[in-house]
From Swiss-Prot:
It comes from the Bacteria. It comes from Streptomyces lividans. The keyword Oxidoreductase applies. The keyword Cell division does not apply. This is Non-heme chloroperoxidase. GO terms for molecular function: chloride peroxidase activity. Belongs to the AB hydrolase superfamily. Bacterial non-heme haloperoxidase / perhydrolase family. The lineage of its organism: Bacteria, Bacillati, Actinomycetota, Actinomycetes, Kitasatosporales. Keywords: Chloride, Oxidoreductase, Peroxidase. InterPro entries: AB_hydrolase, AB_hydrolase_1, AB_hydrolase_fold, Epox_hydrolase-like. Homodimer. Residues 24-254 form the AB hydrolase-1 domain. The active site is at S97, D227, H256. It is an enzyme of class 1 (oxidoreductase). Its EC number is 1.11.1.-.
Length: 276
């Protein structure tokens, strides 16, 4: 564990486990979580001999809580600072949800040789919010409701999200894990309310179309068809179509947080893609 200081003085917390000569796999978490959300996958890849790295986005987890920089350009710049500090080359970057947007923006701008492959898991690209150019997106009012709920009672909102749509625990017959709900809440409450509030616009309104078009490394696009947070039809197949070298993997009936609810399904596919 350590920190890297960005150009604006923000300290970014990160974990760095495994052999320094191992192939680096970098994990990017979703909103409003932390690097801890990838614990299962980090241990899995560590057991296969990889070097595994994950950071807490600014304003999230154990990183600093600055008043500025809660946008995709800055998130990507923070990742660049981390990869440069650790001198990561030929890395695989895996992003979930908001972290998938961060991966898209970073990889599209990365120095040659820094990135070998990327994975977008239940990721927000190409763009979430509805507009004239994205008529199938979610109405802005959905994200206004997110902001209102966060501002009114963040602690309760951070119980409601994982108890319901995030993990699909609101579906009939779902096996509810109180541990996952509590873990989600704890990660969320570690971060800064202002950062989480502003990040809602970052993950919902940022258009990653041009980023996806610029990426030329192989990309696995993995998404559950019962994603109630980032609807499958307006995300994964559209991203795969924009990417030059994409593999689309659909998971029938799996939720947004499938990396935690179904790691035994997702992890082997991630490993196979990294090794391919």
């Amino acid at each position: 564990m350590g920190t890297v200081t960005t150009s604006d003085g923000t300290n970014i917390f990160y974990k760095d486990w495994g052999p320094r000569d191992g192939l680096p796999v970098v994990f990017h978490h979703g909103w409003p979580l932390s690097a801890d959300d990838w614990d299962n996958q980090m241990l899995f890849f560590l057991s296969h001999g990889y070097r595994v790295i994950a950071h807490d986005r600014r304003g999230h987890g154990r990183s600093d809580q600055p008043s500025t920089g809660h946008d995709m350009d800055t998130y990507a710049a923070d990742v660049a600072a981390l990869t440069e500090a650790l001198d990561l080359r030929g890395a695989v970057h895996i992003g979930h949800s908001t972290g998938g947007g961060e991966v898209a923006r970073y990889v599209a701008r990365a120095e040659p040789g820094r990135v070998a492959k990327a994975v977008l898991v239940s990721a927000v690209p190409p763009v979430m919010v509805k507009s004239d150019t994205n008529p199938d997106g979610l109405p802005l009012e959905v994200f206004d409701e997110f902001r209102a709920a966060l501002a009114a009672n963040r602690a309760q909102f951070y119980i409601d999200v994982p108890s319901g749509p995030f993990y699909g625990f609101n579906r009939e017959g779902a096996t509810v894990s109180q541990g996952l709900i509590d873990h989600w809440w704890l990660q969320g409450m570690m971060g800064a309310a202002n950062a989480h509030y502003e990040c809602i616009a970052a993950f919902s309104e940022t258009d990653f179309t041009d980023d996806l078009k610029r990426i030329d490394v192989p990309v696995l696009v993995a998404h559950g068809t019962d994603d109630q947070v980032v609807p499958y039809a307006d995300a994964a197949p559209k991203s795969a179509e924009l990417l030059a070298n994409a593999t689309l993997k659909s998971y029938e009936g799996l939720p947004h947080g499938m990396l935690s609810t179904h790691p035994e399904v997702l992890n082997p596919d991630l490993l196979a893609f990294v090794k391919s």
